[in-house]
Regions:
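N-terminal Rossmann-like NAD(P)+-binding domain of SDR-like oxidoreductases, especially those catalyzing
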Residues: 1-171
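Generic structural signal for alpha-helix termini and adjacent loop/cap motifs
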Residues: 15, 36, 84, 102, ...
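A structural alpha-helix within SAM-dependent methyltransferase catalytic domains
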Residues: 21, 100-104, 153, 189, ...
Length: 307
């Protein structure tokens, strides 16, 4: 199959590109490199350094005979969305809508969209949250992802486009950007590389459902290979406090230092843990990488980058 991966030089997208290519698919990547890095790009992928809103994208889709779109280019920072909601909406709603219109006009068969579990569900009323949990986002980022999901549902119903929404829990792993606030594991790893203490926001008892990017890539392969139209959580169902995460990472690193605590962040929910039962029962996917194994892989990646 000929697949377009947007954001394919980025953290999650680059792993998906690798997985698709290993499975024998032909992959085209578009990335404006605002956060992606060429060093993460698989050399077997065809690469175009353009923005999704560039009119040339239609010609790229035509010339590469694209059958499926996997849309991972996005604004991913909750804090940035609070500062500039308009930029967030342009990135996560308008660009998604542009791609959806291209997909319909060119009769592309499938559209896979990277969404978010934690930010869409907001403060959970039950644990773990399944796909039927009320959506009550606490940030413009969560709002924009939910709006994009609704557009996918519309395009599926109105035009028959096969659409798959994957709602990720907190993804971590190699290639993650340590700059900003989106990836706490990467931020902690970078500080440890400098022999600095990890800084935990608030009291550290807030919880997240951490999932390895390798498991996310496998979920995207299943979404491509199966007719799984709809919305699916991709998570571990395991709840980990930020304090516990820091302790585990310090143990992995062997560093004889402790974590510090800073101020709490606006827009953060207190608990987040996601139920992946629907995706598992429908298509057999389940997480394979333990938290500690994933932290070892991520820490070693940052260590090798430093060396």
């Amino acid at each position: 199959m000929n697949i377009l991966v947007t954001g394919g030089a980025g953290f999650i997208g680059s792993h998906i590109v690798n997985t698709y290519i290993e499975a024998g698919h032909c992959v085209t990547v578009i990335d404006n490199l605002s956060s992606g890095r060429l060093q993460f790009l698989n050399p077997k992928a065809k690469f175009y350094e353009i923005d999704i809103l560039d009119p040339k994208i239609t010609e790229v889709l035509k010339s590469e005979k694209i059958n499926a779109i996997n849309h991972h280019a996005a604004q991913i920072s909750v804090s940035e969305s609070l500062i500039d909601p308009l930029f967030d909406a342009n990135s996560n709603i308008i660009r998604t809508l542009q791609l959806l219109q291209c997909a319909v006009s060119l009769k592309i068969e499938k559209f896979i969209f990277a969404s978010t579990g934690g930010a869409i569900y907001g403060e959970q009323i039950y644990f773990p949250a399944n796909e039927d949990h009320p959506c009550q986002p606490l940030s413009p980022y969560g709002i924009s992802k939910l709006s994009a999901e609704n557009y996918l549902s519309f395009f599926n119903q109105q035009f028959g486009l096969s659409t798959t929404v994957l709602r990720y829990s907190n993804v971590f792993g190699p290639h993650q950007n340590p700059h900003g606030e989106a990836g706490v594991v990467a931020i902690f790893c970078e500080r440890l590389m400098k022999d600095q203490k990890p800084v935990v926001c608030g009291d550290g008892e807030q919880t997240r459902d951490f999932i390895s990017v390798r498991d996310i890539a496998q979920a995207n392969l299943i979404a491509l290979d199966h007719s799984c139209t709809g919305k699916f959580n991709v998570a571990t169902g395991n709840e980990t406090s930020i304090n516990s995460l820091a302790e585990c990472l310090l143990r992995v690193s062997g560093k004889k230092i402790s974590a510090d605590h800073g101020s709490a962040r606006q827009g953060d929910q207190s608990r987040s843990v996601i139920d992946y039962k629907k995706f598992h029962e429908g298509f057999g996917w389940q997480p394979e990488v333990s938290l500690e194994q994933g932290l070892v892989e991520t820490y070693n990646f940052f260590k090798n980058q430093t060396n």
